[in-house]
Structure formats: C-alpha cells, structure tokens
Amino acid sequence: MSAQNLLVEIGTEELPPKALRKLAEAFAANLTAELETLELAHQGVSWYASPRRLGLRVIALDAKQQDKEVEKRGPAIKAAFDADGNPTKAAMGWARGCGIEVKDAQTLETDKGAWLLHLAKVAGQETKTLMVDVINKALAKLPIPKPMRWGANKTQFIRPVHTVTILLGDELVTGEVLGKQVSNQLQGHRFHHPEKITINHADDIFDVLKSAYVIADYEQRKAQIRAQIEAAAKAINAVVAMDEDLLEEVTSLVEWPVTLTATFEEEFLAVPAEALIYTMKDDQKYFPLLDQNGKLLNKFLFVSNIESKDPSVVISGNEKVVRPRLADAQFFFESDKKKTLESRLESLDSVLFQKQLGTLKDKSARISELAGYIAQQLGADKELAQRAGLLSKTDLMTEMVMEFTDIQGVMGMHYARFDGEAEDVALAQNEQYMPRFAGDSLPTNLISCAVAIADKFDTLVGIFGIGQAPKGDKDPFALRRAAIGALRIMVEKELPLDILDLVAKSQTLFGDKLTNLNVSTDVFEFMLGRFRAWYQDEGIEVDVIQAVLARRPTKPVDFDRRVKAVSHFRTLDAAEALAAANKRVSNILAKNDITSEGNVDESLLTDDAEKVLAAQVAKFATELAPLYASGNYQEALSQLAGIRQSVDSFFDNVMVMADDEAVKQNRLALLSQLSGLFLGIADISVLQK
C-alpha cells in the first residue's frame, strides 16, 4: 500500500505566544490519536508553529485503511430456529441487516453456547476522504480556554483563521475546516511577504515558507535566535544571561528573527539592576546584557520580526519604547527611598492576608515571633531574625513593587540596605521567598532561613487551621510549594528543627483565630506527603520511603538521614534476608500482642542459637546507641547487617512458640528487642526485593 507525507497548516492571526508550543503539541497528539483510532499507519507526527500558523507533518501516512473483516454476531442458535428448524423472525431480520440469507450464516461456538455469525468484509476508506473530519476533530480538542468568533462565521477558534492547507503528497485534500475551504495557499511573513504563496507538495513546506520570510520549524528558529543573541553579545564583549522562558516566548513572537543591539542612558543604572532587568525582560521582551563581572550594562538585545534596510530606525524605536519604562522605575525607586520600610508597617494593616487570619501586619508580627524562635534554636541572632521578619512584607507597600510585583523581596533588600538595616536583615527580605521554584537556590544564612521557614509555616498552619487544605489541583495559597520549600531548607541546610514543635509555636501566635482542632496532625501529614513526593521525584524507591514513614520522624533532617541510610542498606547482601526476618518477627509479635520491648532472662536461654542472638542484640544495643543519638543511621544499619547469620540460625534452630510459657515469653522478648534495633531507624520489614 502506497504511503504519502501529509501536511496540515492552519494560518491564523497572531497566536498567544505563551500558549503556542502547548497548542502545537496538543494538535500533534490529537491527530496521532485520531489516526490510531482509524488504524491509519504512519511513521510519525511532528509539529511546527510560528505566530501565525499551526502546522503538522505526518511521515509516510498510508493512502487508505486496510480492508478488514468485522464479526457481526446474530441471535443464539436456540432463538434463531423454531422447533421445525425454520429461521425465526429474529434470525431473518438479522440476516437481512447483514445483506445475506440465514442459510449463508456461519456458526460461532463458545463456552456459553452457539450463535449465528457473519464475517463482513469492510473495505478500507481512502485517507484523503477521512482527513477533513480527522483534522476538525483534532482541532476541536485543543486546550483553548476562551475561543473566539470572527466576522459572520459561527466557527470558534483561539484566533481568526485565514488559511487551511491539507496536502497528501502533491494531492490537495478538499473540504472545509474551521469555516474555511481547504486550499494550497499559505500565509507568508506579514510584512516581507504579505501576498499568499502556493505550495504544491507537502514535502516543500519549509522551503516554500522560507522563501516567504518564515522560519517555520520552531526549534530551528529558537536555535537561530539563541545563536544570534550569543554572537551579538560576544561582539561587544558582553554576556547575556540567557532566560529560557524569555527565549521560548520570543521564538513564539517572530517568524523571521533579526537580533539587534540597543542602548539606554547610563543614569538609569543607579536603579537596582533587578528592576531594570524585570522591565526589559517582562515588559519589553528584551535580553539585558552584563559585563564580564556580571554587572548590568546600559545595553540590551532585542529580536525584531523584520529585516530592515535601516536597522538604526528599528533600534531607535525600541530605545524610545524602553526609555519611559526605565524612567518609571527610576521615579519609583527615588520616591520609595523617601520612606523607610519601618514607616510602612502601619500601612500593612490595610491589606488583608486572609479574612479569618488578619492583615499583612498581623502576619508580619507572627513571622517576626516565629523567626526569632527558630533563630534561637539554630544559635542565630534572635533580634535580627525578629527584625527581618517584622519588615518582611513592607516592600509590598512600595510603588516599585506595586508596579513590578515579581520583584518583591529583592526591592525590600535594596530598601533595607538604603535604610541602614543590618546586612542579614536586608538579605532576608529577598531570601524569605526562597526557594521560589523547583531547583531554586536556598537562603544563604541562618537569619534568612529562619524568616523563610517562619513565613512558610505561618501560611501552612494558618490555612490548615481554618480548614482550607488543598483539594485536587486547587492550591490557591501555594501550600505545596510552601511545604516543600520549608522541607528543602531544613534538609539541605541540615537544620535540626522539629515540624510538630514549629506547628505548635505557630498555633499559639494565631490566638483564637484557628478553628481546626486537628491542625497539628493535618500539617504534619501534609508535610510527610510532600516528603514522599520529593523523594519519589529523586528516584528513591517507594518501599524505602514507606519504611521511614512508618517511624514518623518529626525532624526533616533526621527523616532525610534515615531515608539515605535505608537506601544504602537495601544495597547490602544481608538486606533481603533481614527484611524478610523482620517481617516474620513483626507478624509473630503482632499475633502475640507484643507492643513493647520486654526484658530477656538469660537463665531461660537454653538453645545455643538463641544465646548467640541474645548476646549480639545486647551488644548492638550498647554499641549502636551513640550512632542513633548522633543520627548516623547509615553506619548503624551497616553494622546491624552483621546480625543476619545469628537471626537465620535462630529461626532455623529455635521454636519461638515453646510449650513452656516462660521460655516462649522470653523468646518473644528477645525478638522484640531485635525488632527494636531496626525500628530505631525504620521499619525494614516493608522493604521488597
């Protein structure tokens, strides 16, 4: 069966840049699913996209479906014929529907009886006759939250559609898609090639579009922009801090990228670099430039969508556009410096954090107290932590942050320095929000850690305390991010803080505002759940995590040490046998209602195997105590692996459930002590092969 490459392109008005990749990928996935449903074989579906088009290419798509036989089961034999062997009305009606006589039907024999059967041959349809319906279905399933109508057309899509092209090899597939007749006409570049262009073969798509000033291949266009930016920066001995999200967005904004260099007045460099960078990147989609020491230069790169005969005009235009934005930032900065952060505390009372939990001023006071409490436990300066916590939300009341919300914290740091606050206090204004996302940096000092943890626990305890835990995908207060952020800080900075202790302290700071009496348990369970998700993302086996969760450690750094110890233990030769033995011990103790360790009476030890095991258990109990106390669980489990032979010998030679009740209870006490050695770290009985 012959196969041809398929081309599908939807030409539109400018598509939302941040949604472009998602739309194209979904379009490809939807078409792939539709082709699979129709059993049309091919060698792959790929997408391309630009601001004014969504395109798909299907390699070696079969020209038609395979012919196939379809089983059409009729009535049961018992119901198909009467007592005289004549076909019943049911049988004749079924046969008529199949286009046959009852006598021509076959019989299907099964365990449950026999039925009439007809094997109908169904001819496969030609691909070109199916494509319009397939494309319409694939487009209808795109993730478009707010589709729009245009003109007198009742069709809805993300943006108005101007062209639809479907080519199977060199053959045009006819029909209507999104209210437009399919044609072999494509849109070129809006300015460089405003006329429609004709394409005669699916394989020519990239060459045809390139002739019309469109680099259609998304990844090729992205790579070209990256190379242009790096070359332009290198040409002036500058460094570009490549922002992948910005690069992605710019790729979705242009069809014929041309990178140019522009400048702005040096006086603007007196404004904190973060504010200028935010303005250039987020507002204007420019790429800021740094010198070799990482200091912001008064130059930037931008990617134009036109290849101008006079680039200076384009450069001048962009410089004129950015200048007022930089001037605004300069004005806000100078204006904000006229008031100290401390003087803005009262204004926080006018901003609600959450209706039941009070204002941002209330939250700042709670953060201050909790940060001081945490700092004290860490041996850090309590007063500095309290001061940093008190000022932590004041920059939200500055003009700069009100205008550029994403630079909250970093502006607080700059203003705190200008106010003469201690450097640790200033740094904490920015680092309180760390980590902002997965893989982000953590606070750099203990004061910042204290404030960051305090802020996150205040939110967790407060929101759980009023019964608004996350449900499904809904997490309006970003509690999952707060929990994993606090855990990361405590684990990676090795801070010996206790979750339940912090929750209890935080609870007291809310007074009578909290209505959930189970807030402590709820927050703890939620954080254990975040631990599980974190470690699974890190590739830790689920049974290792469960082994540690069974012991419910309340200190994150302690939890982490146990997980690492059990992960290492799993690699030892003795691990599998000891896990099985512990499971056996656990079952024996459970059946005999043994819930605590008993004392072993040496005079009742009669078998050599139990004497050896008892001696080893006593020896390990003494020798491992310092390792448990210091959290050196990996070494403790490594040493415990040496008890395997004694455990195996015990179960091979000793009858635990002895007839003598005293001997039985003594042996149960020994097993309880053995179990306790491992349970001091984790429940290794849950480990699997």
UniProtKB/Swiss-Prot annotation:
It catalyses: tRNA(Gly) + glycine + ATP = glycyl-tRNA(Gly) + AMP + diphosphate. It holds the Pfam family tRNA_synt_2f. It is found in: Cytoplasm. It is an enzyme of class 6 (ligase). One of its GO terms (molecular function) is glycine-tRNA ligase activity. One of its GO terms (cellular component) is cytosol. The keyword ATP-binding applies. Its EC number is 6.1.1.14. SUPFAM superfamilies: HD-domain/PDEase-like (SSF109604). Belongs to the class-II aminoacyl-tRNA synthetase family. This is Glycine--tRNA ligase beta subunit.
